[in-house]
Amino acid sequence: MKSAMTALALSVGDPSGIGPEIAIAAFLAREAVGLPAFYLLADPALIASRASRLGVSVPIVETTPALAAQVFARALPIVPLAARFIDSPGRPDPANAAGTVEAIDRAVAACLAGDAAAMVTCPIAKKPLYDAGFRFPGHTEYLAHLAARHSGVEAMPVMMLAGPDLRTVPVTIHIALAEVPKALTTELIVATARITAADLAGRFGIARPRLAIAGLNPHAGEGGSLGLEDEHIVRPAVDILRAEGIDAFGPLAADTLFHARARAGYDAALCMYHDQALIPAKTLAFDDAVNVTLGLPFIRTSPDHGTAFDIAGKGIARPDSLIAALKLARTLADTDKKAAAA
């Protein structure tokens, strides 16, 4: 059982990126920003080395998940990994891949065992992982694999970008724009919307979520004159969702979907492709947008940026998005717990 004293698990990400230093910076700002307790899954020597490079003093205590919340007020709790890292900021090394993956594995296991209220992931880079034999497209797909392996639940992970004023969900994600019309199906839209509505209700505490469904084509196709996908694929999905009692409406023209008055009318916007979802989310909340993975049997958030190898180790990386991810993970965990007890 996840109690109020159960800390969040934070995986360190690629140690050559900014993950270690934004974790340090977030911890040092914990009192000023009201940060919930977390423990870092990492190599303690890496964190000490990075703090030294940055010229900052951070107290570190090696601990267990059960004791992390008690430690957090006085020191950065680190649950040590078996792997050891090479501290090479800005220079990714496949030798660090095993530890990067171990941190993710242990965060998932902690969530499923009740040893973490939720997991937050610092950014990873695909190439050093691929060079070491990792064969998953990215974080999200690997998390779905782990969820199935640990719990027997086949998960369909759904990506959400959540900011203070907007939540967006891309139905198709990391594929070329030219491939989107072929990948987009009524069934995929319906499945994505169902998961979004369920998590908005269960974890975000929104009793009757309102889903705005964006059209694929300019002006949502203008009745078929600018493409048939909105009439033949998107609109049938909306009809199915409404028949199921989900408050979905659309297809809506994307060019007028994200201004303030429009945003007041929905709780999340389902977008048909990656940039349709991420451009408005990052424009409105570049520093504090959070990536939330819906549809998993545990809560996972992450900062909405990458490893930033170009600035790693220079002391200029901002922890804002990680702080937002930690806070949102705590909120979602608390809401999920209340919903489960109701």
From Swiss-Prot:
Alphabetic keyword roster: Cobalt, Cytoplasm, Magnesium, Metal-binding, NAD, NADP, Oxidoreductase, Pyridoxine biosynthesis, Zinc
UniProt keyword Oxidoreductase present: yes
Record: residues binding a divalent metal cation: H174, H219, H274
GO cellular component annotations of the record: cytoplasm
Superkingdom, taxonomy of origin: Bacteria
GO molecular function: 4-hydroxythreonine-4-phosphate dehydrogenase activity; cobalt ion binding; magnesium ion binding; NAD binding; zinc ion binding
Textual note on the cofactor: Binds 1 divalent metal cation per subunit. Can use ions such as Zn(2+), Mg(2+) or Co(2+).
Cellular location(s): Cytoplasm
Pathway given in the UniProt record: Cofactor biosynthesis; pyridoxine 5'-phosphate biosynthesis; pyridoxine 5'-phosphate from D-erythrose 4-phosphate: step 4/5
Transmembrane segments: none
Binding-site residues for substrate, renumbered to this chain: H139, T140, K282, N291, R300
EC number(s) on file: 1.1.1.262
UniProt KW Cytoplasm keyword: yes
Essential cofactor(s): Zn(2+); Mg(2+); Co(2+)
Pfam families: PdxA
Any single biological process term in GO: pyridoxal phosphate biosynthetic process
Catalysed reactions listed for this entry: 4-(phosphooxy)-L-threonine + NAD(+) = 3-amino-2-oxopropyl phosphate + CO2 + NADH
Family: Belongs to the PdxA family.
Subunit structure, interactors included: Homodimer.
Matching PANTHER family: 4-HYDROXYTHREONINE-4-PHOSPHATE DEHYDROGENASE (PTHR30004), D-THREONATE 4-PHOSPHATE DEHYDROGENASE (PTHR30004:SF6)
Task performed by this protein: Catalyzes the NAD(P)-dependent oxidation of 4-(phosphooxy)-L-threonine (HTP) into 2-amino-3-oxo-4-(phosphooxy)butyric acid which spontaneously decarboxylates to form 3-amino-2-oxopropyl phosphate (AHAP).
Further remark: The active site is located at the dimer interface.
Protein name: 4-hydroxythreonine-4-phosphate dehydrogenase
Gene name of the encoded protein: pdxA
